[in-house]
Amino acid sequence: FGVEIAHKDYQEFFIEGNQRYTSTNYQIEGDWSGAAPMLVAGAVAGEVTVENMSRLSLQADTAIIKALINAGAEVESTDTSVTVRRRKLKAFEFDATHCPDLFPALASLAANCEGTSIIYGTERLLHKESNRAATLAEEYAKAGIEIDIDEPNVMRIRGGKIHGCTIDSHGDHRIAMSMAIAALTADAPIVIKGAECVAKSYPSFFDDLEQLLVK
């Protein structure tokens, strides 16, 4: 856009005021943190394709692809889309230190895996919309899934049968989306209190789930 930016080792940035902007064509990338729950839906419940997603993106949350592959899901990508297909899922290890917004989606993935998955980086979750590590453990327990956060900076999720229940989103959009994806394979409906909080980052989340014929 014609604006000059100075920096110190890309840690500090300095932008002089009163610069003149110039028009240009710019393509805005899809949001990988928003796409993550839908990609997990494909891994646990059927085939899902998300458009306008580039594997060459610099967004840290592209790491969801690595987690899906490690768990055994089939992943196919093009220059503009990612498709995930359900396969038999196995426990996985993953370091989410640099992509903490993936924790809720990873929880719904791990809940559907055979064995105990280990995810590192829980210290990054203390000051999110809720204390996400504690909230995930509390709400998934209601669905019969054990999440152990006793070890510093580590979350262990024992996959198993997901039961219908009523959960509280705690006003956290990613918790609501995580439990909605978990509900896809539950043995009875999961009721999510405060589900409207998804509007913070993904207002059409439930509409998009309905397009996948989810009820």
Regions found by a protein language model. Give the residues of each.
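Short, structured segments at the rim of ligand-binding sites
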Residues: 1-215
